[in-house]
Regions:
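Conserved aromatic-histidine-acidic binding/catalytic patches
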Residues: 16, 41-45, 205
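Protruding loop/beta-arch "assembly-hinge" segments enriched in small, turn-prone residues
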Residues: 205-244
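Assembly/oligomerization interface modules of large self-assembling protein complexes
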Residues: 1-27, 51, 232
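Alpha-helical scaffold segments that mediate packing/assembly in large oligomeric complexes
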Residues: 25, 29-112, 235-236, 240-244
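Short loop/turn segments at secondary-structure transitions that flank enzyme active sites
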Residues: 25, 34, 59, 127-129, ...
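Short conserved micro-motifs at the rims of enzyme active sites and ligand-binding pockets
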Residues: 1, 40, 132-136, 170-174, ...
Length: 244
């Protein structure tokens, strides 16, 4: 920069990314006494319902973003397509079955990350167990903070999330590491108010609500996410034992 100097291109490059929001639904049948219950009792029921919705929504987002599956069926979703880590991230470290050198595997995965900071890691419970079993040359645990099933928020200063969704609905996924702060984004496009349905068979269970003295509570939301920088991540998969 110089006084009266000519302005030049700053080097930033912008490319549009299209993120298509996906509608997700959560519902539960409850007794039709919900309609006539006191305000206090209805609030208690709705609190429990909302807690369930929040947990299912978080789990569903993980499964869709990690593996590109329909959380309800476990099958690949054509709507999600390649907008998931398993399809978008090409940097892969295959660990031998048994995950004997889990620490070395993570070091190899981090070495593959290109163009981004390593800001976090998501690991499956079995990978956490493998890390807990790592020892130093003198036999002491390499990660004593993982003893007895403990799942700390950080390991070696790196934020870590131990989550079953890393391996659920996937044959070999065990860990994801990379720039979760800058390379992946998600959010709500729209949240639809809670609906209380008193008639019909809204969950296609074959059981009429009136016939079973029930009402159906339904909550829906539109979620969107994107793996903005696939090169800023690496995946760890576990080799499959032949004949197992």
């Amino acid at each position: 920069v110089a006084e009266s100097g000519k302005k030049s291109h700053g080097g930033i490059s912008l490319a549009p990314r299209t993120i298509v929001p996906i509608k997700v639904e959560y519902g539960a049948r409850v007794s039709d006494e919900f309609i006539y219950a006191s305000d206090e009792e209805r609030i208690n029921i709705l609190k429990a319902f909302n807690d369930g919705f929040a947990k299912k929504l978080a789990r569903g987002l993980d499964l869709m973003a990690f593996h590109g599956v329909n959380p309800r069926s476990g099958t690949a979703s054509a709507v999600i397509g390649d907008n998931n880590f398993d399809a978008a991230v090409d940097q892969v470290v295959e660990a031998p079955a048994g995950l004997e050198d889990a620490n070395g595997v993570i070091e190899s995965a981090i070495a593959l990350v290109d163009g981004g900071d390593v800001t976090g890691m998501a690991i499956a419970p079995q990978f956490r167990s493998a890390l807990a079993g790592q020892t130093r040359t003198d036999g002491t645990p390499l990660f004593p903070e993982l003893a007895w099933g403990n799942a700390p928020d950080t390991i070696n200063g790196l934020p870590v999330d131990v989550n079953k969704t890393v391996a659920d609905m996937s044959e070999d996924a065990r860990a994801y590491v990379g720039d979760f702060q800058g390379g992946f984004k998600w959010g709500y496009a729209k949240q639809i108010p809670l609906e209380v349905i008193q008639y019909g068979d809204p969950d296609n269970s074959g059981l009429d609500l009136k016939g079973y003295n029930q009402v159906y509570l339904r909550a829906e939301a539109y979620l969107g996410w994107g793996v903005l920088a696939p090169e800023a991540f690496a995946r760890v998969v576990e080799g499959i034992v032949e004949g197992a």
